[in-house]
Amino acid sequence: MIRRPPRSTLDRSSAASDVYKRQGDNVRDSTLYVTLEPCCHFGRTPPCTEAIINSGIAKVFIAVEDPDGRVSGKGVEQLRKAGIEVVLGPGKEETKVDLEAHIKLSETGLPFVTAKFAMSLDGKIASSSGESKWITSEESRMVSHAMRLESDAIMVGVNTVLVDDPRLTARLENRNVDRQPLRVIIDSDGRIPVNSSMLSEDGSTFVATARNVRFSDRIKNLSTRAFPDKKGKVDLISVLEYLGKIPVSSVFVEGGSEILGSLFDQGLVDKVAAFISPSIIGGTDSLVAVGGIGAKFMSDKYVLTGVKR
């Protein structure tokens, strides 16, 4: 293995270029295995196909054709025209899962959305007083941090910021984190406190509002934009479309209940990461994991597939 796959769209670079840079003529007449079709256009790096052709590699196994319109079979065509044997499809289904965010972004222009929540056995994410630390275990939180690190962005609603004052960073034991995900705050009226803990952390924060709001210029790495819907709330579809153009390919949504409910109501959730504690909180005033309108009939409920523990 020359290198591992990239963890996000924001830091994706060419594995094929790495092969040529690190190995030079040592790879001549060898076989290359890649998960995604090599790119054939100029971006942050030169075309991957150019590096492969120049390296003298004789055969390339490609698991998945890149649905990105700039590639979409053209990379394979360039390699074959250069006399390189190309084999498509080995490991395709497994690889499509690994590349699910890139595939969705390329096909729809929208990021892949993972809804994450930690709840009690009766579906509560906080007590009636609003207390939520901690429902699940330290081990669960470490898994959550690893999932943050794999994401381009972390999204929460402003109520989560006001109640919990989260740092919204990826923190792993015994490992330096060189890139923090973009923090996305859904905040209709611009209520995020300027002394929020996250604003002093590494990385950038983006506040999506429903009206034009100006924050202090002294706050570093903070940007904002209005996405009003007809009800005076933040238009979540417009936010996701905007993020997709950055490009942000994956969004890890950590609540709260209102944001998760809105995303489910609009059919914007692609994956669910539920951490369930063997505990009961109870109470009609305790927050449930997913708010919103919800399913009126059982036939309207979300049914999850590919469930893993």
What does each of the following model-derived ranges do?
Residues 17, 94-107, 187, 191-198:
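A short, flexible N-terminal coil/short beta segment enriched in small residues
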Residues 76, 90-118:
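Proteins enriched for Cys/Gly/acidic motifs involved in redox and nucleic-acid/cofactor modification
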Residues 44, 112-309:
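Enzymes that bind and transform nitrogen-containing heteroaromatic metabolites
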